[in-house]
Amino acid sequence: AGTLEPGEDPAQTAIRELEEETGFQTTELEPLNSFFLSPGILNERMHLFVATNLTAGPAQREPGEQIENYVVKWDEAMKMACDGTIEDAKTLVGLLLYDQKRR
């Protein structure tokens, strides 16, 4: 997840954050969904995208970022989403929405 920079649209942010946090690069994004994180309290909106045709590279994390990336098969990701291994709400929403879309 990342913050929209001034003048940046959500797709640009997604491409930038993908590279910074994982090292992967893409120019092909498909919007998946967007939603409010805490309606009634905040107007913060989460935008989800599906990135394809990825090119691997080194992550470019900011100082202090503690991120561990995992590559797992799709069935394992779904198991992790459903058994409570994945606890991050935006990750769960993204995985479950994409799972429905790909059926």
PLM regions and their residue ranges:
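Helix N-cap/coil-helix junction residues
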Residues: 23-24, 86
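Nudix hydrolase/Nudix homology domain
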Residues: 2, 31, 39-42, 47, ...
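A short coil-to-beta-strand element that immediately follows conserved catalytic motifs
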Residues: 25-32
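A short, charged helix-loop
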Residues: 59-60
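Conserved Nudix-box catalytic region and its N-terminal flanking loop in Nudix hydrolases
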Residues: 1-16, 54
